Structures are given as C-alpha cells and as structure tokens.
Amino acid sequence: MKKALLCIFLSALFLIMKDESFGQANIKPRLNHIAIYVVDLQVSTAFYRDMVGLDTIPEPFHDGKHTWFNIAPKSHLHVISGAESPTVHNKNSHLCFSVASVDEFIKRLDKNKIEYENWAGEKKSVTDRVDGVKQIWFKDPDGYWIEINDAKEQF
C-alpha cells in the first residue's frame, strides 16, 4: 500500500514539475488597460458611459483627471484629461467593442445624432465581414475611432 501511494505521489510530482511554469512567475502578458488622452474629461466620460455603454470603475487618483471603465474581465479603458485639442486618428487604429445587435446600437447612435459609417467610409452604412460579422465605425469627441461589431463569440 505504501509503495502504491509513493508511486502515485511521485507520478503527480513529476507531472507538476514537468509544467514549465512550476515555481516560476507567469510572464505571459495579458491586456490590463488602454489609455486615451482627451480634451474634456466630463464630455468623454459621458460619451463612453452613455453612448458606448461602458461601466465606470473606481480609479485610485481621485484628482479629477481620470475616469476608468471596465471593458473586459481585468481589462480597463483609462480616459485621461489634459490633451490640448482632438487629434486626427487613422481608422486602422481603433477601439472595438462587440454588442449583441449592431442594429440596436445604431438606433442609439441615430437617436443621439452620432454619425457612423462602414469600413469604406459610406455614411450610415454597415460592413458585412466575410465571416458574417456586422461592423460600424464612429468617432468619440476627441477623434478616436470606435468599431462596434456583433462578433458572435462574445455572446
């Protein structure tokens, strides 16, 4: 009986030690946050909260220059005030959020008179990606591009 228990213990120990991460810190990176620099923190906070639909989370500074939003488990969007003016951004550099229904999201944009377009830049148009995902793009108050899609793996 003792030999059987010892054999099981040694087998388990071997399997644990075979794992390369045993005894080492996990160094594989994961997304923690994305930060954007904005002109008017109140305007941008309202936009990301009310238009995009993100939830605010506590931020540690309490200095009136930061708003943090939850964007995924353990991942955040940090909105930081201090920019002197909005800047021009290429559409290829964008934030992307998935929603259950692009059509319902478009209703929110239309109600608030927020212009959106497809990838080609056609106003009030939707891109239908080759894999069936619907996409639209619009800008935040500081000119950052935002993509909204209905990527099904998110829901």
Label every PLM stretch briefly.
Residues 1-26:
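Bacterial Sec-dependent N-terminal signal peptides
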Residues 36-76:
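Core segments of cupin and vicinal oxygen chelate
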Residues 40-42, 95-142, 153:
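Vicinal oxygen chelate
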Residues 63, 91, 132:
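Exposed loop/turn and edge beta-strand positions of beta-sandwich/beta-sheet ligand-binding modules
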Residues 66-111:
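Mid-chain, structured segments of secreted extracytoplasmic proteins
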